[in-house]
Amino acid sequence: MRTLWIMAVLLVGVEGSLVELGKMILQETGKNPVTSYGAYGCNCGVLGRGKPKDATDRCCYVHKCCYKKLTGCNPKKDRYSYSWKDKTIVCGENNSCLKELCECDKAVAICLRKNLDTYNKKYKNNYLKPFCKKADPC
């Protein structure tokens, strides 16, 4: 249980259904979401904000923008369900807001996988986020 709490605090975006988001990232990238993305660049994880450092960091920036576009639900609290079929994330909600929330998380997981080649260890564990340059608005 403690491991899940730590994961919830450090995950990319720190919002939404953190357990599901973490599972999606692990399934798509094969990387531990906490240790690989919990404090990556300027936008992944806690206090994430600023001009993206690379394509991987941009995935997290776009994810935060996706959450900002949601209406009628609470990305910080609402939970959704999804399945993993044939190495594909399938969002399984009838509620439109929860489906959109799931789609935001699915998109970031896929984006992180597609940009694994841009992952730069020098941006991992970036606890200097207050020094990140201001990003353009979503």
UniProtKB/Swiss-Prot annotation:
Disulfide bonds join C42-C132, C44-C60, C59-C111, C65-C138, C66-C104, C73-C97, C91-C102. Snake venom phospholipase A2 homolog that lacks enzymatic activity. Is myotoxic. A model of myotoxic mechanism has been proposed: an apo Lys49-PLA2 is activated by the entrance of a hydrophobic molecule (e.g. fatty acid) at the hydrophobic channel of the protein leading to a reorientation of a monomer. This reorientation causes a transition between 'inactive' to 'active' states, causing alignment of C-terminal and membrane-docking sites (MDoS) side-by-side and putting the membrane-disruption sites (MDiS) in the same plane, exposed to solvent and in a symmetric position for both monomers. CDD domains: PLA2c (cd00125). Pfam families: Phospholip_A2_1 (PF00068). Residues 121-134 are annotated as: Important for membrane-damaging activities in eukaryotes and bacteria. The record marks L128, F131 as: Hydrophobic membrane-disruption site (MDiS). GO terms for cellular component: extracellular region. One of its GO terms (molecular function) is calcium-dependent phospholipase A2 activity. The record marks K121, K124 as: Important residue of the cationic membrane-docking site (MDoS). Keywords: Disulfide bond, Myotoxin, Secreted, Signal, Toxin. One of its GO terms (biological process) is phospholipid metabolic process. Transmembrane segments: none annotated. The record marks K129, K134 as: Cationic membrane-docking site (MDoS). Belongs to the phospholipase A2 family. Group II subfamily. K49 sub-subfamily. It is found in: Secreted. It comes from Bothrops asper (Terciopelo). Residues 1-16 form the signal peptide. PANTHER family: PHOSPHOLIPASE A2 FAMILY MEMBER, PHOSPHOLIPASE A2, MEMBRANE ASSOCIATED. Expressed by the venom gland. This is Basic phospholipase A2 homolog M1-3-3. Homodimer; non-covalently linked.
